[in-house]
């Protein structure tokens, strides 16, 4: 009963539905219905303000992980020197301002979904570490050599053309292939 009530409350909080009846929106809804029950990684592409975050939330809410955490990270908003600590956590004393142990976003999302928004803005070094977690399903916090297993479905979004970024050498091709198991393109609003 408590689980059911939690789901109902989460739907009220997260319950933003995609509006519109255009063929493009209907196709996105159809993709969400097909993809949500799987654990496949999804890359959501579209211009700023098109609703990529809404697509990610709807994927999580319709998934088998909907009762588990949904954690969002805006990769563009976190300075490159902090992204590793933010995503993977850190141990007390691992750097000057690490006054206590901190669980990263991957650990916080364990069992649920991690949404990496604006992944195209992530540094190559951070991309390599994300790739390692996706491949091995484990991470180690900054300042630790202990592996922590994580079970996380990763959704990512970008407003950039990642194939062009790969050609420029600013995005890892292997990470692109890991993230783009399924690609959902969100049309611009014009």
Language-model features: where?
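ABC-type ATPase nucleotide-binding domain
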Residues: 57, 178, 182
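Short, solvent-exposed beta-strand edge segments and adjacent coil->beta transition regions
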Residues: 13, 181-184
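AAA+ ATPase active-site-proximal loops
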Residues: 7-149, 154-160, 165, 188-189
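Charged helix-capping and loop-helix junction motifs
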Residues: 168-171
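Receiver (REC) domain switch/output surface
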Residues: 1-2
């Amino acid at each position: 009963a408590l689980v059911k009530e939690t789901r109902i409350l989460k739907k009220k909080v997260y319950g933003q539905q995609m509006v519109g009846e255009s063929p493009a929106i209907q196709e996105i809804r159809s993709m969400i219905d097909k993809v949500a029950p799987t654990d496949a990684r999804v890359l959501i592409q579209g211009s700023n303000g098109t609703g990529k975050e809404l697509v990610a939330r709807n994927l999580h809410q319709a998934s088998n992980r909907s009762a588990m955490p949904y954690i969002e990270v805006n990769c563009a908003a976190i300075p490159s020197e902090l992204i590793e600590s933010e995503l993977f956590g850190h141990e007390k004393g691992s750097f000057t301002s690490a006054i206590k142990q901190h669980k990263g976003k991957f650990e916080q999302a364990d069992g649920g979904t991690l949404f990496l928004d604006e992944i195209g803005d992530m540094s190559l070094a951070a991309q390599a570490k994300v790739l390692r977690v996706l491949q091995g399903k484990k991470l180690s916090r900054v300042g630790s050599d202990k592996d922590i297993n994580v079970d996380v479905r990763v959704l990512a979004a970008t407003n950039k053309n990642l194939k062009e970024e790969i050609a420029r050498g600013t995005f890892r091709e292997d990470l692109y292939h890991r993230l783009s198991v399924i690609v959902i393109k969100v049309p611009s609003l014009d």
